[in-house]
Amino acid sequence: SKSDWEEALKDQDAIVHYAAETGTGQSMYEVEKYVDVNINGTALMLNLLVNGSYNVKKVIVASSRSIYGEGKYISKELGAVYPTQRESIHMDQGDFEVKYPNSSALTLVGTDEESKIHPSSVYGITKQNQEQMVLTVCPTVGIAGVAFRYQNVYGPGQSLKNPYTGILSIFSTQIKNGNNINIFEDGLESRDFVYVDDVVEATILGIEKDEANYEVFNVGLGEAIDVNTVA
């Protein structure tokens, strides 16, 4: 709410904006909620910074890997490509590979900050909007904006009840309850998992270092780990 933001912004030099609804799947059937909390909530913060009197000098916004959609791949025929969502007709046949028109098999490569942005969920769209608003509005009032595109964060304090916090929390809950771990598809889909302490360290550096101002950073381990390995 406006009053919450007004209280949060008082006497602060820097704001680390984590307030958001999370969950790519959930966002597809709770569209209004995600847009209202993530986009409108960020707009409310920025509106206060623009029109109020605060001491804030820097805003760090928590973005997400989800803004890249399926990510970056290399095609022998076409070079770097950015596939859209996989089609159910292929997945129903047990074919879980990402495809691209007029291309043979694709090779997954690291998705850097210069890669194409094309979110495949409402959640991803809202995170893209959040970072663009912060990086666009903040400089107009002398505030440095920084966007961190966090990968799959895990560690102490992570909810084991919320199914939208990622597979590590889901697997942990299954193990804790003495259940078998269910792996969907072929288990070869991969993610970059980053420990929460590393995320905290990166975020602190973003606050302290002027070199981070007005920049976008991926925050991850830099290593693809497939689901079978995690399990």
Question: Across the structure, where does each feature detected by a protein language model lie?
Answer:
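Residue-level signal for the nucleotide or nucleotide-sugar donor/cofactor binding architecture
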Residues: 29, 37-40, 114, 121, ...
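Generic structural signal for alpha-helix termini and adjacent loop/cap motifs
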Residues: 30, 48, 52, 174, ...
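Glycine/proline-rich active-site loop of Rossmann-fold NAD(P)-dependent oxidoreductases
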Residues: 128, 141-143, 153-169, 177-179, ...
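Hydrophobic alpha-helix immediately C-terminal to the catalytic Tyr-X-X-X-Lys motif of short-chain
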Residues: 129, 133, 137, 167, ...
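CheY-like receiver
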Residues: 7-8, 174, 202
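Short aromatic-enriched loop/helix-cap "lid" or pocket-rim segments at secondary-structure transitions
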Residues: 70-75, 158-162, 230-231
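N-terminal Rossmann-like NAD(P)+-binding domain of SDR-like oxidoreductases, especially those catalyzing
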Residues: 1-151
